[in-house]
Design a protein with these regions (language model features):
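Low-complexity, acidic/polar, glycine-enriched regions of mature
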Residues: 1-176
Length: 176
């Protein structure tokens, strides 16, 4: 892991071609369903000290993709994201340390604080002269907190879909 102190100050824009925003939910409490969002934007304004930096993400909720058209259509419906009414979800950092970022996550007009742990993987210059920075982050939310409460109880206990959703981010930014 690189030292965050080596991140040059200034504006950094997400590189969607080298980034993945993914999630994991439990299905029937015995297996995992994985998916990702494919349409998003993000900007980091790195400052010194790092605690003065800003981070903002916008994700297009209709870009939700698990590889199952039927499941994706259900999750995009009013039972979950309601993409027609709430086309985006956003994250805005409120506190940044050397290994955690806390911010306001807004889904379906509900805003809750969320903390992600992260690793800064360093800075590199690509063959075309662009300066790039890489991060890995992970966190967890309770989907019920954001009004996504659809579920069904199971005969043996448990529920159809886990309330806790794990979020994983593999991020690459390009210096503006």
């Amino acid at each position: 892991m690189a030292s965050l102190n080596t991140l040059p100050t200034g504006t950094w824009n997400i590189d969607p071609a080298h980034t993945e925003i993914s999630f994991v939910a439990r299905h029937l409490m015995v297996t995992k369903v994985r998916g990702k969002f494919t349409d998003y934007s993000a900007t980091v304004v790195a400052a010194d000290p790092i605690s003065d930096s800003s981070v903002e993400f916008t994700v297009q909720t209709a870009s939700f993709d698990t590889g199952s058209a039927d499941r994706d259509a259900h999750v995009k419906s009013g039972d979950f994201f309601d993409v027609e009414t709430y086309p985006t979800m956003t994250f805005k950092a409120t506190q940044i340390t050397d290994d955690e970022i806390t911010g306001d996550l807004t889904i379906k007009d509900v805003t809750k604080p969320v903390t992600f742990s992260y690793d800064f993987n360093g800075v590199a210059t690509d063959p075309w002269g662009a300066t790039r920075a890489g991060f890995e982050a992970s966190g967890e939310i309770n989907r019920n907190d954001f009004g996504m409460t659809f579920n069904a109880p199971l005969d043996g206990g448990g529920v159809l879909i886990s309330e806790k959703i794990k979020i994983n981010l593999d991020l690459e930014f390009t210096k503006a």
